[in-house]
Amino acid sequence: MRADKIHISQFEFLTLECLEIDREVGEHATAFISGYIRDKDVEVYRGKLLERMWVNITGEDEEGNTQNLMTGLIAGFSLEPQPHATRLTLTLKSGTFLMDGNKHYRSFQDTGLTYLEVLKTINQSYGEADVKVNGGLEASTIDFLLQYNETDWEFIRRIASRFGMAVTPAITREGAYYFVGNANFSTYTMSESTRYSVSKRVDSYMTQGGSGSNPLMEQDYMEYRITSRDIYDLWDRLVLGNEGGYVCKIQIKYVHEELTHTYTLRPINGMRVMLKSNMDQTGCSFLASVSEVRQDRVKIELAGDENTGQNRTKWFPYSTGYSSPDGAGWYCMPEPGDRVRLQIPDQMEEHGYVISSVHMETGKDRKNPDHKSFKTKYGKELLFTPDSVELTNNKGMSISIKDEEGIQIISNKDISISSRGNMTVSSEDASLVIAGKKQINIKQGGSGLLIDKDITFTGGKIRIQ
């Protein structure tokens, strides 16, 4: 189809001064419209422009056939008085522009979710929105995804890049509709007289070509450009003899009442997208609370996470003070409810791990920084002070080692000391005191000493010197 007439919905232009439409794989579609309207329509149009409004740009050929060139949301406008008329300028954006406004902070911790289900979850907040995918997103499940300081559009493009795929806005309906991967395309064979230019993106090849698990070849960075009055779509395959490629960019201009299209083509491998990363999250720590603990892993709830009602099945490794592959090290897990931090060491949030617990409020036992303690929720405590070490259950039992006073063992229950070898109790420079409120009983085999008001010796022979 070759369009000769242009129709702009919602507005009646006396003359159309300028029309430009730019479309590119991975970017919002943009249209720029400029023309003259009647002065009497200015007030009515001003009221419309202050509301959210969708505009259809339609092309019509000589036979009356029409085709939607773009349905876009008004993203900007101006009204400029001119002699005998008013110039109206409009800037339109594809519906995906709605997804590129607010930055979000949310996590996806359900390891049973597919990437497609994640995208559909994001789409829900936009009402009129949907996605069509091609290339594995509907079958591949996530491990852990973190959207930090990213718009939904940035996050969606980053997800798609994990599969080497681009995101293409749909422009023929109102709403946030888009494709991930190869949009439905058709193949067209251009005439032999078609003129085209050829170029190579050498800079892109030098920075991208040899990297990744599936490196691209130099010829994958070839680009072909043709200008035509025929209307094609992104991802359409245009054959130019033995060359050609897939449409990755379209520039439409309406000049002298004639609509022309400039198409940029790339080989299919050249349509692949390199892995995108969120550099803002690299090296960051995020406050969280522990919800469950198992072995050396924890489940967490991130503070401020927008995705509050999700099913959390992701187990994060917990970092301790020291750990080695053979199992040696420090094993000390946090308790449910403890405040911790999620550490993201690099560009992949799946590599994140949980680190040290954070004490948010000062307790009565945390007043003196010279005191170091290790305490469980059951009250068992190991306390280090500048002049002592104390092990206690805080229920009447303790062992104290004090620099000035020595060692003290206190128990409100039995104390049992046993040995299969020799046992020596001695005092080299002072006294040895054995005291019992009821009795003292010392035994060895059949011999013994019993002190219970009276003193009783038992044995085959008793020698007193």
Protein language model features and the residues they cover:
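Short beta-strand-centered interaction patches in the first periplasmic/extracellular domains
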Residues: 87, 94-96, 135-200, 351-355
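Surface-exposed, non-catalytic interaction/assembly patches
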Residues: 100-109, 154-157, 161, 180-234, ...
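Right-handed beta-helix
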Residues: 122, 157-159, 169, 229-232, ...
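Short beta-strand-centered aromatic/proline hotspots
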Residues: 68-79, 243-253, 288
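Exposed beta-strand/loop interface patches that mediate assembly or binding
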Residues: 246-253, 257-386
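Surface-exposed cap/loop segments at beta↔alpha junctions
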Residues: 43-130, 144-145
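Juxtamembrane "anchor/assembly" segments of surface/extracellular structural proteins
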Residues: 1-52, 93-97, 181-230, 243-253, ...
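Amphipathic, non-transmembrane alpha-helical segments in extracytoplasmic/periplasmic proteins
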Residues: 33-34, 92, 106-130, 148-169, ...
